[in-house]
Amino acid sequence: MTKSVTVKDLKERLNLELICSETGLERPISTSDLSRPGLELTGFFSYYPEDRVQLFGMTEISFSEGMEPEERLKRYKQMCTKRTPAFVISRNLEVPKELVAAAKEADIPVLRSRLKTTRLSVYITNYLESRLAPVISMHGVLVDIYGLGVLITGSSGVGKSETALELVKRGHRLVADDNVEIRQEDEMTLIGSSPAIIEHLLEIRGLGIINVMTLFGAGAVRSSKKITIVVHLENWDPDKHYDRVGLDQEKTKIFDMDIPKITVPVRPGRNLSVIIEVAAMNFRLKNMGYNAAEQFTQDLNNLIGHNSSMND
């Protein structure tokens, strides 16, 4: 599932000035890639990425000013296709009247920004990548624990929401409960958020639906968070081997990314919120270069080696 973006959305997000063709603001934008139509101004249209936002900077405008008006109008008309979303001019540069005429005829919006071309390009690309990123929904709870986005998964009734409530009481922040919308902003980033209709809400069996922001304040929630680790809760299986040292690192795949995963068995008497809290701290410590399990194994091997040499 992908979210649609219109030229109007881009205009409002970046506070762009509309030069012409207001009725074309509902044109869809289908890609985050931008085009700098320098070669097109010379007449090269063998490859013209017509579905991209066309960005004009100082180079393109300066080059076009050296062209004859008739040729300039011809080139701009060639750029105006049914799939072209919009033309964007940077640096508050003067918009060529031929571009305005061609855009009006094709009902393509012409927008202008005061930003420099490179910075404007970055802002547009980042915004479109965020909005056009592929999205999936996962059953689980997303909590911000010590700055880490922890996605808690598990079968229905295993205690995910109750654990999240305890984590909120311990000072952490709820992002989403029950249904987590996950979008892949780039090859290394997964962002989780809540559907608008259930944002800030927790469903607790026997208690019902509670509003976390109303009960605990604005500091207890956040709208989105990068997913760093997955904690999977499952009912204790006496026949299953669970990691007791921490040397093995499980992974789970979301989109095409491998996310670190910790499986926590659930049974009466285990304080899941504390376990997950410590798991987040331990994961952060590993990223800082210290692994308690590896250090223990190394110390144990050194001790065994020392005792063996003493016995020889």
UniProtKB/Swiss-Prot annotation:
The keyword tRNA processing does not apply. Its cofactor is Mg(2+). The active site is at H139, K160, D178 (proton acceptor), R244. GO terms for molecular function: ATP binding; magnesium ion binding; phosphorelay sensor kinase activity; protein serine/threonine kinase activity; protein serine/threonine/tyrosine kinase activity. Signal peptide: none annotated. Its EC number is 2.7.11.-, 2.7.4.-. The Walker A ATP-binding motif also binds Pi and PPi. Catalyzes the ATP- as well as the pyrophosphate-dependent phosphorylation of a specific serine residue in HPr, a phosphocarrier protein of the phosphoenolpyruvate-dependent sugar phosphotransferase system (PTS). HprK/P also catalyzes the pyrophosphate-producing, inorganic phosphate-dependent dephosphorylation (phosphorolysis) of seryl-phosphorylated HPr (P-Ser-HPr). Homohexamer. This is HPr kinase/phosphorylase. It comes from Listeria monocytogenes serovar 1/2a (strain ATCC BAA-679 / EGD-e).
